[in-house]
């Protein structure tokens, strides 16, 4: 007897609002097929990861943790513990002893900063053992998503025996597009291999994605939907707004196109590259901005030696000023995935004479 499904494959499964880092949040409509096809694509790469235990710290209101952590582990009968409070995460790692973790770059950076303080020559040789104990002693790999992971942070973990499976995707792609496996073949400098059943093309430098994981559109926002969903060769493609390249089957993410800008002297600034170059001179969170200005500027929570930075970067990238605010002020502009709402933060600085 045929079964009448209450919610068919093309029926709405979830409505997830983007974090609004580049504008107003938009409701992303994802169907059952979108999510299930993405889970199947991940399964083809990793297998069912049977009897894997993990500890949740990320909000399930976002598709990365919802699809990759919640649905995937429920589907394959894995154990999933829920952290009682973010402040207890490190303590509960020792109790749960997870074999897999699903984290965002900011969490990995915070743990790196805590453990790096003990990275002294006399104990450097035992740092892998110390890190292993921090994560409970049974950790096999960490999935990192939600934003691009800093290369230095990735190398820190990899060099100390912890495999980082960095992936790339968007809410609009349900979310996974590519991911690095914890076994060969892998390229830790990349965002991994493109998943089965997902197509990626680079069009004028922009990453565009096609597949059954592409959203049906934005809720009650046909204009924005038409801006990002295009038809090409009888296929629906999603314009990610990210620049990147493909080499040897691996996807490399360069920057968020909307974050880049031109100075008033006509010089183009790749913000993420510049931030990565000067990160070693700044303690704590910060961003760079300077659109339509003569020089770049920094917003940070600490004092910054601008002279030292300018000695070590190209002249046209010169930093003019550091707008110092409190940690509490800066944290107001974090999304739930701990990325920064850049435009809102810059507007706050410029409108409040910080």
Stretch-by-stretch model annotation:
Residues 81-83, 154-204, 213-217, 226-235:
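Conserved ATP-binding loop and adjacent catalytic segment of the adenylate-forming AMP-binding
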Residues 287-289, 310-354:
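Conserved C-terminal "lid"/linker of ANL adenylate-forming enzymes
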Residues 241-243, 280-304:
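C-terminal boundary motif of the adenylate-forming
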Residues 36-53, 60-133, 138:
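Conserved AMP-binding/adenylation subdomain of ANL enzymes
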Residues 99-103, 111-185, 285:
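Gly/Ser/Thr-rich phosphate-binding loop
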Residues 194, 201, 208-263, 267-268, ...:
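Conserved ATP-binding/catalytic segment of the ANL
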Residues 2-17, 24, 47-53:
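Conserved pre-ATP/AMP-binding loop-to-beta segment of ANL
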Residues 13-39:
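Conserved AMP-binding A3 loop
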